[in-house]
Design a protein with these regions (language model features):
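Anion-binding alpha/beta catalytic cores of soluble intermediary-metabolism enzymes, centered on
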Residues: 1-267, 272-335
């Protein structure tokens, strides 16, 4: 069974309620139809039912009738959700009038469904920007306890089974926080290890905090940040297996790890890689993807109290379908 097959199987085993607020986007609706047909999640669509069914008929989709469809313009819960939004944001300048307007936005409405306990996760981005996806999530659902920054992990399925977990690595941050400080980097480490467990199914995440230095081989303030982040990550999660700073070869190659970091439990055996900044992470995963012919699944947003994931506006139907399964796995772990 491949990694994505195992993710889908886990999603099927305990179906979660996943909101797809961009319901009139053709790829999204097609992916919803596939997810409903395969029973990987209970899908909630936001929008006018007549318009959604008309698009489904045009696309030849047969399973949309199995979805829960909620129209913010007519839902009996809209007023209560508007009140909830006002209460959550009144100290930030929210007014009842503004809340009544925002609740009609499908992305806000979906996050309010989750906050109210009526759904488990949300996926958008086929039409919306990352900012439009994250803003309601952070305002309504907020970050996980002990976490103050959102980050993005990527599942890297490589052609080299001797690395990571049979060739699978979970890496972060590749998507959100450009220049994390030591505290944020520690949070990214903890969250990426959790993603490795909940989504990739790693029983034993081994986290390497990457740098251009291994265990003091170089001196620089950016190395100091990684060392401090490693210490803080251990404080955040005393059970986390994490070491740093490590160079990439020392983290992945057993013979190199033994030479550069003798006695290390992680060196040469890492399956979770944490990059010192977004610039490095984004470049590194794309190089591995293109030059190493690796499959990259994600980014998977992490650090939010309930899963909210962001798609590329160039995403495929298959990308959205996979993200439904991934979000479902995250939702199980978040409960």
């Amino acid at each position: 069974m491949t990694l994505i097959e195992s993710i889908i199987a886990r999603a099927k085993s305990n179906r979660q309620r996943i909101v797809l607020p961009e319901s009139l986007e053709e790829r999204t609706l097609t992916a919803a139809d596939m997810a409903l047909a395969d029973e990987i999640a209970d899908i909630i669509l936001i929008g006018n039912p007549d318009e959604i069914f008309a698009l489904a008929e045009k696309l030849g989709l047969k399973n949309i009738g199995k979805a829960t469809i909620i129209d913010p313009a007519t839902s009996e819960k809209t007023a209560a959700y508007a009140d909830l939004l006002y209460e959550l944001r009144k100290n930030k300048g929210m007014t009842p009038e503004k809340a009544a307007q925002l609740v009609l936005d499908p992305l806000y409405f979906g996050c309010l469904i989750i906050k109210s306990g009526d759904a488990d996760g949300q996926i958008s981005g086929a039409l919306s920007t990352t900012g439009e996806t994250l803003r309601p999530a952070l305002q309504i659902i907020k970050c996980s306890p002990g976490i103050t920054c959102v980050s993005g992990a990527m599942l890297m399925i490589t052609q080299t089974p001797e690395y990571g977990e049979d060739g699978v690595l979970v890496v972060g941050d590749v998507a959100v926080t450009p220049m994390p400080d030591a505290s944020q980097l520690a949070q990214i480490a903890v969250c990426t290890a959790q993603t490795a467990k909940s989504v990739a199914g790693f029983a034993d995440p081994k986290v390497a905090m990457l740098s251009f230095s291994t265990m003091g081989s170089a001196k620089h303030e950016v190395v100091d940040k990684v060392i401090e982040a490693t210490k803080l990550a251990r404080e955040l999660d005393p059970n986390l297996k994490v070491e740093g700073e490590l160079q990439a070869d020392a983290a992945l190659v057993a013979s190199v790890g033994q030479k550069k970091a003798p006695g290390s439990e992680i060196a040469g055996h890492a399956n979770v890689l944490v990059f010192p900044c977004l610039e490095v992470g984004n470049i590194a995963y794309k190089l591995v993807q293109r030059l190493g012919n690796a499959d990259a699944i994600g980014p998977i947003l992490q650090g939010i109290a309930r899963p909210v994931n962001d798609l590329s506006r160039g995403c495929s139907v298959d990308d959205i379908y996979k993200m439904v399964a991934i979000t479902a796995c995250q939702a199980m772990d978040a409960k």
